[in-house]
Amino acid sequence: MAERINQHKNPIIGTNIVRLRKERNLKAIDVIAKLQLKGIYVTTGIFSKIEHGRNNPSVEIIIALTEIFECDFNEFFKCL
């Protein structure tokens, strides 16, 4: 099981994921498909919870999202 960053939920991470996704004109289902191509299987429900700040993404998911969004960690964690 992938390690969590911490146990405290942080809605800013989800907000940043939504912002980065929309800036790249991607739908949530597109990002989920790209994650699956990288061998990371998340359901639409889990991804929605991550975007809404109800679940923290694993380190594995964060790394994959920075690759999908072609951004660095500073951009990913902006405003934290």
Label for each model-derived stretch:
Residues 79:
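Conserved short acidic donor-positioning loop in nucleotide-sugar-dependent glycosyltransferases
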Residues 15-36:
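Short basic helix-loop element that most often maps to the first helix and adjoining turn
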Residues 17, 31-32, 47-50, 76:
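Conserved hydrophobic/aromatic packing and binding residues within compact polymer-binding modules
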Residues 36-56:
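Recognition helix of helix-turn-helix/homeodomain-like DNA-binding domains
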Residues 1-12:
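A detector for short, charged/polar N-terminal pre-domain segments
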Residues 56-75:
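DNA major-groove recognition helix of helix-turn-helix/homeodomain DNA-binding modules
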Residues 17, 28, 44, 59-62:
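Helix-turn-helix DNA-binding elements, focusing on the entry/boundary residues of the two helices
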